[in-house]
Regions:
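Membrane-water interface at transmembrane helix exits
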Residues: 26-31, 65, 100, 104-108, ...
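Hydrophobic transmembrane alpha-helices
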Residues: 2-59, 68
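Membrane-embedded alpha-helical hairpins and interfacial helices in multi-pass inner-membrane proteins
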Residues: 113-188
Length: 188
């Protein structure tokens, strides 16, 4: 029994390492706007389906790597990145991946792949990421940068610029997750 447990945890460590790499790569592929559009949202949402709550470990490792100075974030790295308005999205990824991962791994594989559950999981992930990212970004703009920008301008910068892309990608990752979870998803 102990050998089977060791194999399971070895797989988790391997999957988490690959997940950190995928998160970093998806952050580097970006469309340059005031808030760069990356593919991290879709990548992390897909990883939630595949890894469950272990996706939170991958996101945590990614954030720690960036904060200690490795240039893994979309705009570099280092501890000063916490003053970047986009850092709130990374915090949202952390909390959202935990909640979404728990939803995605509750029950057996056939229950996890029901469309209603998958849409709910991605929707909750969406809310956590955008709520945390937007509130954090507005706070940084108003209290650190002292920009005193208009509310609707900030909503355009933090929400409306990227919202459409993430909604479209949600419709892509759900069918992709339905195919990949039975193949490589963690089974408890």
């Amino acid at each position: 029994m102990k050998n089977k447990s060791n194999i399971f945890y070895s797989r988790i460590v391997s999957y988490v390492a690959v997940a950190v790499l995928l998160i970093a790569i998806s952050g580097w592929i970006k469309i340059p706007l005031p808030i760069p559009i990356t593919f991290q949202f879709a990548t992390i949402a897909l990883l939630c389906f595949l890894l469950g709550e272990y996706c939170t470990v991958a996101v945590s490792v990614y954030i720690v790597m960036g904060l200690i100075g490795l240039p893994v974030f979309a705009e570099g790295g280092g501890f000063s990145y916490v003053l970047n308005p986009t850092f709130g999205y990374l915090l949202g990824f952390l909390v959202g991946s935990f909640v979404c991962g728990k939803i995605c791994t509750f029950g057996d594989v056939s229950t996890r792949l029901k469309p209603k559950r998958m849409i709910t999981a991605v929707g909750i992930f969406f809310v956590f990421v955008y709520l945390t990212g937007t509130v954090y970004g507005i706070c940084i703009f108003n209290f650190y940068v002292e920009a005193n920008a208009d509310f609707w301008y900030l909503m355009t910068v933090f929400v409306f610029n990227t919202l459409w892309k993430d909604v479209i990608l949600c419709f892509v990752i759900i069918p992709l997750a339905k195919k990949l979870v039975p193949l490589i998803g963690l089974k408890k």
